[in-house]
A protein has these predicted regions:
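Flexible, glycine/proline-enriched loop segments at strand-loop-helix junctions
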Residues: 111, 133-145
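Thiamine diphosphate
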Residues: 1-127, 134, 151
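A general structural signal for short secondary-structure junctions and capping/turn motifs
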Residues: 91-92, 155-159
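Residue-level detector of conserved catalytic or cofactor/ligand-binding positions
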Residues: 159-169
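Short, structured patches in soluble enzyme cores that scaffold and shape functional sites
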Residues: 103, 139-142, 168
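Phosphate/diphosphate-binding loops
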Residues: 141-142, 157, 161
Length: 169
């Protein structure tokens, strides 16, 4: 297999397209702005839908709607944006809908810094919103793992979503 050299965020976006992502809803925020930038240029060419939302809150609620309609939906953000998305994430978790959320973490509390960090791991694994729910978190240690985990994330989300739909019938 031929090796390719990619920037991490662009590799994640390309992996999502190759994984069959139908739609991406996002809002630019450092350090993940390359993800929506790449998706805007390449997802429509693959037959998908890209929409830059007016806010992080709008983006996660668009994912909620798309996932509810059976689409392979994805969004991305970084720490402050993920915090803004928490209410929408609780709705998605409560409805047991499949989606992929990429968090390009950055350091510090509040708005923090623009350097990478891992402070959001606790929020992601323990639920940042109200209610009793957990989200499945895949935490890559390098770009190759990030690419592999994107495909895995879509596959797991589909399995969980289909299973929860069968349970409700």
């Amino acid at each position: 297999m031929e090796k390719e050299l990619w920037k991490g965020n662009e590799a994640i976006a390309e992996a999502a397209i190759r994984a069959g992502c139908d739609c991406f809803f996002g809002y630019p925020i450092t350090p993940q702005s390359e993800v929506p930038e790449y998706m805007s240029a390449h997802l429509p060419k693959a037959g998908g839908v890209f929409l830059q939302s007016e806010s992080e809150v709008a983006a996660i609620n668009m994912v909620y709607g798309a996932a509810g309609a059976g689409m392979r939906a994805m969004t991305s953000s970084s720490s402050p944006g993920i915090s803004l998305k928490q209410e929408g994430i609780t709705y998605i978790a409560g409805a047991e809908l499949p989606c992929v959320i990429v968090n390009c973490m950055r350091g510090g509390p509040g708005l923090g810094t623009i350097q990478p960090g891992q402070g959001d791991y606790y929020q992601a694994t323990r639920g940042g919103g109200n209610g009793y729910y957990r989200t499945l978190v895949l935490s890559p240690s390098n770009v190759q793992e990030a690419v592999d985990f994107v495909q895995e994330a879509f596959d797991i989300a589909d399995q969980i979503g289909r299973a929860s739909c069968r349970e409700r019938v």
